[in-house]
């Protein structure tokens, strides 16, 4: 029989663990909710307001001219993005309902791989026309800079998916009875 001091410490420890679990679960739900909100905002903006991705020029008479930076190839990439955003929203809703470590990690790995596919397709299709920028140097440099940035994003996402996968495997190996 543990002494009263040890029993109190064990009970206090148990409460702290429960508090921590509740906070982290609440934090994950907040994260899932923020992700859902962000994905819906992106879905709406990039589907219905893409024409505002443009170079704006103020004319001498005060009017504003909007020159689109997107080519018609944007509409070849848009279904890929919309599909990924819808999958992400659905996955985050599912994770709010069912929140287990192994499930969460698998879903996050899948979503990250989908992100790599979306970014890789964006680089491949490259639906941008930077010729509307009035600076010749910027017109030459911007496509290169955007391509490099997108490749770095894709590689970063790929590394993130790999790290999550390794952590998941290590966690599962530690949990399996030997």
Regions found by a protein language model. Give the residues of each.
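N-terminal juxtamembrane cytosolic/stromal segments of multi-pass membrane proteins
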Residues: 1-37
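Transmembrane alpha-helix entry/boundary detector in multi-pass membrane proteins
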Residues: 59-82
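Alpha-helical membrane-embedded segments
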Residues: 147-164
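Membrane-helix interface motif
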Residues: 44-63, 120-133
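Cytosolic juxtamembrane helix at the C-terminal end of the final transmembrane segment
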Residues: 2, 159-178
């Amino acid at each position: 029989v543990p002494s009263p001091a040890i029993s109190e410490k064990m009970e206090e420890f148990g409460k702290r663990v429960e508090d921590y679990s509740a906070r982290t679960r609440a934090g994950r739900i907040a994260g899932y909710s923020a992700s859902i909100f962000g994905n819906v905002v992106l879905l709406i903006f990039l589907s219905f307001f893409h024409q505002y991705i443009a170079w704006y020029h103020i004319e001498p008479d005060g009017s504003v001219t909007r020159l689109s930076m997107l080519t018609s190839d944007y509409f070849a990439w848009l279904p890929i993005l919309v599909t990924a955003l819808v999958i992400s929203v659905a996955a985050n809703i599912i994770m709010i309902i069912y929140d287990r470590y192994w499930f969460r990690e698998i879903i996050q790995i899948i979503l990250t791989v989908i992100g790599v596919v979306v970014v890789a397709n964006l680089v491949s299709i490259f639906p941008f026309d930077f010729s509307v920028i009035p600076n010749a140097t910027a017109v030459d440099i911007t496509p290169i800079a955007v391509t490099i940035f997108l490749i770095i994003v894709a590689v970063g996402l790929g590394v993130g998916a790999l790290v999550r996968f390794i952590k998941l495997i290590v966690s599962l190996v530690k949990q399996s009875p030997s």
